[in-house]
Curated annotation (Swiss-Prot):
Pfam families: DUF167
Superkingdom, natural source: Bacteria
GO cellular component: cytoplasm
Classification via InterPro entries: DUF167, YggU-like_sf
Similarity section: Belongs to the UPF0235 family.
Name listed for the protein in its UniProt record: UPF0235 protein Mflv_3569
Signal peptide: none
Length: 75
């Protein structure tokens, strides 16, 4: 069963790679890669997979390819 997860992304961050959970449970992912040629999206997918303990192949970007607010399907 697939699950959808929404995250906020901070590309080009000096803090990254880091995952923070807010008080409301929302995840913010900090990555060092800049949002150029999909590099930040690749880094976010890798970081999310590590954080959730699932293979990268099970994570699919559903929406937000050019936005800081992204939705992923975990399958």
């Amino acid at each position: 069963m697939a699950e959808l997860i929404s995250v906020r992304v901070k590309p080009g961050s000096r803090k990254g790679p880091l995952v923070e959970a807010g008080e409301d449970g929302a995840l913010t992912l900090y990555v060092q890669e800049r949002a150029v040629d999909g590099k930040a999206n690749e880094a976010v997918t890798k970081l999310l997979a590590e954080h959730l303990g699932v293979p990268r192949s099970r994570i699919e970007l559903v929406s937000g390819a050019t936005s800081r607010h992204k939705r992923f399907r975990i399958g």
